[in-house]
From Swiss-Prot:
Belongs to the frog skin active peptide (FSAP) family. Brevinin subfamily. Residues 23-42 form a propeptide. This is Lividin-1. The keyword Signal applies. GO terms for cellular component: extracellular region. Keywords: Amphibian defense peptide, Antimicrobial, Cleavage on pair of basic residues, Disulfide bond, Secreted, Signal. One of its GO terms (biological process) is defense response to Gram-negative bacterium. Its main location: secreted. Residues 1-22 form the signal peptide.
Amino acid sequence: MFTLKKSLLLLFFLGTINLSLCQEERNADEEERRDERNVEVEKRILPFVAGVAAEMMQHVYCAASKKC
């Protein structure tokens, strides 16, 4: 009976360590995915912002030079 308890305790301990390592790996993977999403959002937003800024500069130049 004592040997069985030792074996079960050892299995429980090893399983707990294994689960904690998996959790750390999962957290690292989720962090990488969040970084990738931020880069994707930046890639989509930057051209839009650049286009709006260019158009505003044209309007400002047109109003300042009064050539429109």
